[in-house]
Every structure is written in structure tokens, then in C-alpha cells.
Amino acid sequence: MTIDAKHYDVIVAPVITEKATMASEYNKVVFKVTRKATKPQIKEAVEKLFDVKVKSVNTLVRKGKAKVFRGSFGSQSDSKRAVVTLEEGHRIDVTTGL
């Protein structure tokens, strides 16, 4: 199984929040991914990088918040998250590095 550099470009970071931790009980892992990443690309990257079988991938786009910085208005960038459901018997420990 070969790992290409493109797999590292798809997944940005794991999301470690209370909600994501609760989802891990149901074999789900949440990752921050690039905006242009598609579901098949995310599935392939997770399977190659973590050596697991992916059951499904759900994505969502979080719109950036409007912010005021030193009196000028701006907005944070939009971000994309992927909720990856793993097959039974497979686990990913996101607290360890790649």
C-alpha cells in the first residue's frame, strides 16, 4: 500500500471537540479537510494513511464568522469538515501523530 503526498494534502487536521469525541463511540472520526476535497478523495486518503476501512463519508462546510479587528470588518475563512464512519472493528486514535 503506497501513500502519496496528495493524501496528506487532503486531510488538514483531526477535529477534537466534545461533539467529535462523542461521535467516536459510534465509530466516527471528524477531520478538517481542504475545501476542494471530494468524498472519494477523503475516503481514499483516510484508508491509506490510517490503514482502515471506511464505511461512509459525510461532509459539511462551516461558514466563516464575521469579525471586527481594530475597527475594520472582516470575516474568517470558510472551512470544510468530514465525518468519516469506519467499518466495524476498525479504530483511529487521533491523539497520536501520523
Curated annotation (Swiss-Prot):
> What GO biological process terms are annotated to this protein in UniProt?
translation
Record-level Gene Ontology MF annotations: rRNA binding; structural constituent of ribosome
UniProt keywords, alphabetically: Ribonucleoprotein, Ribosomal protein, RNA-binding, rRNA-binding
Tell me if Nucleus is a UniProt keyword of this record: no
Organism domain of life? Bacteria
Q: Which InterPro entries match?
A: Nucleotide-bd_a/b_plait_sf (IPR012677), Ribosomal_uL23-like (IPR013025), Ribosomal_uL23/eL15/eS24_sf (IPR012678), Ribosomal_uL23_CS (IPR001014)
What's in the GO CC field? Answer: ribonucleoprotein complex; ribosome
Subunit field text: Part of the 50S ribosomal subunit. Contacts protein L29, and trigger factor when it is bound to the ribosome.
The UniProt entry's sequence similarity note says: Belongs to the universal ribosomal protein uL23 family.
Q: What does this protein do?
A: One of the early assembly proteins it binds 23S rRNA. One of the proteins that surrounds the polypeptide exit tunnel on the outside of the ribosome. Forms the main docking site for trigger factor binding to the ribosome.
Instruction: Report the NCBIfam families cross-referenced here.
Output: PRK05738.1-3 (NF004359), PRK05738.1-5 (NF004360), PRK05738.2-4 (NF004363)
- What is the name attached to this protein's record? Large ribosomal subunit protein uL23
Organism for this UniProt entry: Nitrobacter hamburgensis (strain DSM 10229 / NCIMB 13809 / X14)
Q: Which gene encodes it?
A: rplW
